[in-house]
């Protein structure tokens, strides 16, 4: 008997977390996997990771949800969520999967899980029970309560889900699939002899008013450090949370001043 599984991927982070799982499913003849892509996975501004995924994993069926890059910061999350709820729900009705797999805590995950739950499709949630201290906690916990099976990454996460009232027999701890993939991957070596360091700074969804002050203070500190130590900084682009445009605009201004 072949099971129909549907995996929802809506940003590059969830894609990287599930690569080990995608490799595993390649060798399973009893699993028919369909991958639903949406949101920033299809956005040119964020590298169109969906194209990269479809090129690397040609064995699977793909559904690309209609996507609009809404510019309004206030309405963007609401509109994208509504699109996913409607469009993913329609495809799930057609596919009739055995189980739906949802990953982590991005806002796009919640409407995807909601669509499956209200269609009485079992939901398996990956990376529940974690704590980040921002709005992601609310999304993650809401997804947990609407899911039927839980695949956590740590013993502490497992205990959190038990404390939330989830059935122990439905909670599993396979570890972090992203780490498993890193262990299998080759070591990246850089021949450049110059000194570099990496900076990653994402929007603070609970403190948008002060995030530009924090960003500018961090930029000033990094420029001073690079000047005195004769090194350069590799700065990761902020993720697709509300407030990212303000950070991006500030970064571009500073990058022009200090290439």
Predicted features and spans:
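Residue-level detector of structured alpha->beta connecting loops
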Residues: 30, 96, 120, 147-148, ...
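Short internal beta-strands
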Residues: 33-40, 150, 232-239
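A short, Lys/Arg-enriched amphipathic alpha-helix followed by its capping loop at the start of a domain
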Residues: 21-31, 221-229
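Donor-nucleotide binding loops and adjacent catalytic segments primarily
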Residues: 49-50, 190-259
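Active-site and donor-binding regions of nucleotide-sugar-utilizing enzymes
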Residues: 4-11, 15-26, 66-167
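A nucleotide-sugar donor-handling region in carbohydrate enzymes
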Residues: 9, 41-45, 146-213
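Conserved nucleotide-sugar phosphate-binding/catalytic loop shared by glycosyltransferases and other
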Residues: 32-77
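Cofactor-binding loop segments of dinucleotide-utilizing enzymes, especially the Rossmann-like FAD-
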Residues: 10-11, 37-40, 128, 176, ...
């Amino acid at each position: 008997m072949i099971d129909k599984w549907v995996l929802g991927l809506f940003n590059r982070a969830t894609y990287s977390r599930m690569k080990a799982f995608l490799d595993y499913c390649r060798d399973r003849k009893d699993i028919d996997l369909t991958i639903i892509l949406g949101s920033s996975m299809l956005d040119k501004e964020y590298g169109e990771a969906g194209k990269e995924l479809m090129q690397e994993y040609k064995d699977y069926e793909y559904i690309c949800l209609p996507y609009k890059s809404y510019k309004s910061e206030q309405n963007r999350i609401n509109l994208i969520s509504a699109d996913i709820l409607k469009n993913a729900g329609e495809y799930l009705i057609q596919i009739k999967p055995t189980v739906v797999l949802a990953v982590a805590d991005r806002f796009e995950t919640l409407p995807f899980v909601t669509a499956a739950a209200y269609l009485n499709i079992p939901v398996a949630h990956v990376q529940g029970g974690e704590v980040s201290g921002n709005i992601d906690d609310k999304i993650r916990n809401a997804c947990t309560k609407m899911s039927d099976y839980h695949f956590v990454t740590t013993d502490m996460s497992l205990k959190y889900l038990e404390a939330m009232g989830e059935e122990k027999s439905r909670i599993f701890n396979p570890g972090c699939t992203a780490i498993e993939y890193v262990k299998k991957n080759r070591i990246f070596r850089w021949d450049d002899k110059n000194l570099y360091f990496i900076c990653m700074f994402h929007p603070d969804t609970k403190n948008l008013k002060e995030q530009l002050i924090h960003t500018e203070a961090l930029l000033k500190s990094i420029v001073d450090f690079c000047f005195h130590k004769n090194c350069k900084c590799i700065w990761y682009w902020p993720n697709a949370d509300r407030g990212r445009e303000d950070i991006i605009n500030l970064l571009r201004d500073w990058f022009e001043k200090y290439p």
